[in-house]
């Protein structure tokens, strides 16, 4: 609810001037100084993101922003199956082999203690940006030792709003740097990608997130003047020009970006955003759209198989549903678990064969803490 005139005004008139000052976020100015110095010193920079929409958009915001500042930057997006989630120690070794002097994580890293330690051992500067909860044991946070840790969910961070997505966090970082250079055009160019990630990562569309999405949509709907070739071609192929709403991001554009991370390689989506060649942009956008259609078919089949198994066994006698689907693609297990939870309104796990043993995903209902329940089984 809205409990003050100020909150009501921000909700009705979500103007960019009402965004909080970036420097209020812990370590953000420190991260900005490290990044700008690395660019000025011609140090190679490596961005390490994630394979979902937020991870791809976060990576692009950093990549594009650093390129606009004249920096030398490359990106590494983990493969869902081969690498798993988040930065790994060997990714730091890869960066060292490539002569990288600064690593920046986005939408991941807050739980990767080993990677931060490895970077320090190799004398690589390490900026951690994330938006996930900080691992906590008995009330004590376990935070990686990095040159800068930018995560609004840290207890020591007093930023007024801690529900930004990963792209929202790096957007604040880049906007702070560009403000210092008095160039708002670059800030506006990056905004639509923070907006897309905000919707697709399903963070609350309130407070600062609402401002990001509202203003990002205005830029996206001016398709003819949209600077990003890949995003413009995706919008045209999906026939969304000048009719883009938050639902368009969440249910049309987002799933196409996500499909690459689920069925192929998430770097496809990033390549589409990076390219300035119109023919390549169309080719990549079409690939993503095709992958999403395939993902829909796989999800529908796996959901039908799960329902059949539940209905034909005594599964509904148990308060928690656990379903093993041999032929389910592991990348759609979470979507299927969500649909099973919705149908039967009880916690659901979908398991399938992984490279080593079983892999799966779970979706819960209010009042049932899945992580705690799993820990109790150990």
Task: For every predicted segment, state its role.
Residues 1-102, 122, 179-378:
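Hydrophobic helix-and-loop "lid/oligomerization" segment in the mid-to-C-terminal part
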Residues 95-203, 209:
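Conserved phosphate-handling catalytic cores of large alpha/beta enzymes
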């Amino acid at each position: 609810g809205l409990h003050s005139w100020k909150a009501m005004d921000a909700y009705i008139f979500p103007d960019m001037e009402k965004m909080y000052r970036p420097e209020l976020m812990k370590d953000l100015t420190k991260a900005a100084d490290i990044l700008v110095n690395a660019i000025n010193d011609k140090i190679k920079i490596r961005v390490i993101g994630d394979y979902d929409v937020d991870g791809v958009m976060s990576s692009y915001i950093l990549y594009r922003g650093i390129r606009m500042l004249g920096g030398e930057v490359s990106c590494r997006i983990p493969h869902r199956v081969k690498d798993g989630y988040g930065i790994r120690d060997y990714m730091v070794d890869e960066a060292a082999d490539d002569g990288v002097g600064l690593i920046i994580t986005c939408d991941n890293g807050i739980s990767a203690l080993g990677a931060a330690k490895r970077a320090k051992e190799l004398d690589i500067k390490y900026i951690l940006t994330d938006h996930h909860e900080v691992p906590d044991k008995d009330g004590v946070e376990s935070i990686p030792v990095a040159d800068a840790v930018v995560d609004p969910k840290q207890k020591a961070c007093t930023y007024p709003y801690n529900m930004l997505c990963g792209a929202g966090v790096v957007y604040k970082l880049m906007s702070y740097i560009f403000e210092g250079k008095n160039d708002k055009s670059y800030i506006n160019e990056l905004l639509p990608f923070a907006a897309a990630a905000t919707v697709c990562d399903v963070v609350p569309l309130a407070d600062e997130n609402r401002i990001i999405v509202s203003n990002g949509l205005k830029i996206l709907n001016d398709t003819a003047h949209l600077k990003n070739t890949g995003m413009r071609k995706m919008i045209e192929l999906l026939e969304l020009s000048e009719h883009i709403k938050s639902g368009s991001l969440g249910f049309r554009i987002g799933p196409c970006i996500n499909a690459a991370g689920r069925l192929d390689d998430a770097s496809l989506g990033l390549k589409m955003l990076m390219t300035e060649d119109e023919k390549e942009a169309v080719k990549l956008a079409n690939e993503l759209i095709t992958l999403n259609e395939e993902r829909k078919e796989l999800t529908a089949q796996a959901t039908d198989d799960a329902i059949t198994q539940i209905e034909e066994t005594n599964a509904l006698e148990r308060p928690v549903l656990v379903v093993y689907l041999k032929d389910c693609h592991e990348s759609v297990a979470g979507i299927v678990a969500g649909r099973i939870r919705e149908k039967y309104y009880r916690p659901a796990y979908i398991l399938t064969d992984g490279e080593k043993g079983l892999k799966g995903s779970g979706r819960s209902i209010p009042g049932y803490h899945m992580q705690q329940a799993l820990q109790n089984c150990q």
